[in-house]
Amino acid sequence: MIIGSGFAGLSAASFMAKAGWNVTVLEKHDTPGGRARQFKADGFVFDMGPSWYWMPDVFERYFSQFGKKVSDYYQLKRLDPSYRVYWKNEFIDIPANYHALRDLFEQIEPGSAKKLDRFLEEAKYKYQVGLNNLVFKPGQSLLEFCDWDLVKGLFRLDVFNSIRAHVQKYFKDQRLRQLMEFPVLFLGAMPEKTPALYSLMNYADIMGGTWYPEGGMYSVVEGMYQLALELGVEFRFSQNVTGVEVRSEAVSTVKTEKGEIFPADVVIGGADYHFIEQDLLPGPFQSYTSNYWNKRDMAPSCLLYFVGLNKKLSGILHHSLFFDVPFEQHAREIYSSPQWPTDPLFYVSAPSVSDPHVAPASHENLFFLVPVAAGLTNDSHEIRKKYFELIVERFEARIGQPVRDAVIFWKSFAQSDFVEQYNSFKGNAYGLANTLKQTAILKPSCRSRKLKNLFYTGQLTVPGPGVPPSLISGEVVAKQVMKHFG
């Protein structure tokens, strides 16, 4: 029995079915995908969650384990430029071609091209060790890490240094530093608190490339869902899990809001870990206290806007990052002194630049994302409207084109929606921050400490936040189930 059909739940379901288990997935919503759902309105097609497709090798590896290829389920195109970064008075397009990127770095900071070579050589080593070894550890014991290749490479992995300090060793120009720190924002912590190990994300960005699955990120969900069906997985949609029954130190049944009761030999929780622990389990069977959860460093939540325009915008790219205000203040308002941001950085995805099927002809599909602290209150319509006007005004100023008058559709999604729709702890969007003290065995365990047949997968356990890690998380937990239950 698997609770939730997000990326991790879909992954776990397929691995369990491949091993010969009868698998049932209970999903709260009426479609698969969890936070990666899709909605359609007025001819626009919006991805509700992830919008970046990085680490294509992880997706290819996933499907290959079932004798399939990514191209059996969806088609990819590499974006070039990969993305654009706006500062106050300029912007830079990040080319997909590495030689062009070296030239760009050299123009900005003489001598930095060779430094970029050295930086990425280190990042490549971390990526290879991380993707071939570290991320597949279930985090159940320190003994998992008594691996000679890991031990001898410990200092090369740079786990005790911060990514900020690591980047500053190589580059002096503030724009280059921001470019190299940007990928770790996906990991949910400030650069000075994120281990330099995660420069592997720079390798993923630059050498792996930025891709787009035709039809949007939901095409990946549909592909994984189709694979699971082919393997015999049963899906029960609109089944909101409300409780479990425990017998003999094991979950015996899972109950849903409709009053249905599902017997279970093994349960894998792919929904929010905190929700399952604190809301579904009786107190004596919770592995962690509420105090434990309240002390976790959470990745940010998001203020999201899905926007449809009745015209095309000239010269914009699929992905754009807006670093046109100081990062430090926004970072403090997310991590140090949680509050609604004064003047936030933001990100815009315009999938209609790459895909004519996500918007009506001569229209534009825009997705705005503003990172905000997890756990904020007063998520009101007035707050959402205020930030929408602020962000659109800055967007207009940076791209030099009017936008507001062309808006014919907009919908917001924020803290309270993450809680209501996904039972998200503190309304987080990405899970736990990837700090050193929340890495590997220091994350919430992928196996319950109190119930022998309850396991967890997804962004609040190993290996961490992000779509590729979620695919891996499903594989890791499935192998743990097989290890203990055959």
Model regions: which residues?
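Helical element adjacent to the flavin cofactor pocket in flavoenzyme catalytic cores
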Residues: 200-251
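Rossmann-like flavin
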Residues: 88-194
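C-terminal segments that line or cap access tunnels to active or ligand-binding sites in enzymes
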Residues: 310-419
